[in-house]
Amino acid sequence: MFVVGGESLIDLVPVSSEPGAERLALPGGSPYNCAIALAKLGNETGFLCPISTDGYGDLLLGPLAEAGVALLLGERVAAPTTRAIVSFNEKMQASYVFERGAERAFTREGLLAALPERVATLQLGGFVPIEPEDAAAWLAVAEKAVAGGATLTFDINVRPLLVGDEAAYRRQLSRLLDLAHLIKLSDEDHDWLEPGRSIEEHAAALLARPNCELVVVTLGEKGSRAFSRHASASAAIYSPPVFGDTVGAGDSLMAGILTWLAETGALAPARLGALDRAALERTLRFGAVVAGLNCAHKGCKPPRRAEVDAVLAG
């Protein structure tokens, strides 16, 4: 079973580029998107995040149920749903301003109790390392999962506007990365975390951490790269026939990569680090198709497995 932990929220997305344009309320949040994408690709998936009792919380539940994602924290919370106010640049790449709420309404004990006994892979990321108390709770979850034999995967997904104490954030992130077997980051994450350092140097530093065996870096329209302990590879993006926007593209790519690795028996310690160039290329290609099909829509709408297979077969 995949367990995905982290935030869910509502993206308030403008319907046009005009100032003051009406905004659509769309379910989102990086871990939320990844959980749905994993389930739609055919994986048994549980989501570890509180959901509000408000109307936006109802809106979040619909796609989870449709995809078949199990809610691991069953009781909903009174805190309002976290909101992300979305803006787009000329390339339709998204940026966000956040108002946090229900996704933080948890306790360490509650998260640990909700973690299933048998977890094959725990996927964390997004807001998880930002607040010290939250980060400590998620670290305990990660430690429990890894001690039980789970593979830990982590999508860094830095949100600089939410980072009040950069030194504390870096410490909290570092503790989680020390446990992770697979680490994903974007070129924007790289530039914020390691300005002036090459991606190759950054990947090597991550691979030198105690558990890390695979690093994936997304490069926007330039595609993606992967680095194992023995090889590296790159892949181009997949461009859908009709383009919507890039919301959830990285989350969809992550779900695709995890799905491919799990299906090929590589999503496990010692196996990730042994991936050669050809295996990395196939992994990135699968992830790119999942991400590209998501980008055919407005907002995050990851594809079903049959859609991905149809593209790969063509």
Q: What name fits each language-model region?
A:
Residues 1-69:
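Glycine-rich phosphate/adenosyl-contacting loop at the front of the ribokinase-like
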Residues 3, 143-144, 197-314:
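Conserved phosphate-binding/catalytic region of the ribokinase-like
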Residues 6-8, 127, 156, 252:
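Active-site metal-binding loops of divalent metal-dependent hydrolases
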Residues 10, 14, 53, 158, ...:
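Short, glycine/acidic-enriched loop or turn micro-motifs at the edges of active sites
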Residues 44-126, 311-314:
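Conserved N-terminal subdomain of the carbohydrate kinase-like
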Residues 100-109, 162-168, 272-273:
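Short gly/ser/thr-rich secondary-structure transition/capping motifs
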Residues 121, 127-205, 212-213, 222-223:
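Conserved beta-alpha-beta core of the PfkB/ribokinase-like small-molecule kinase fold
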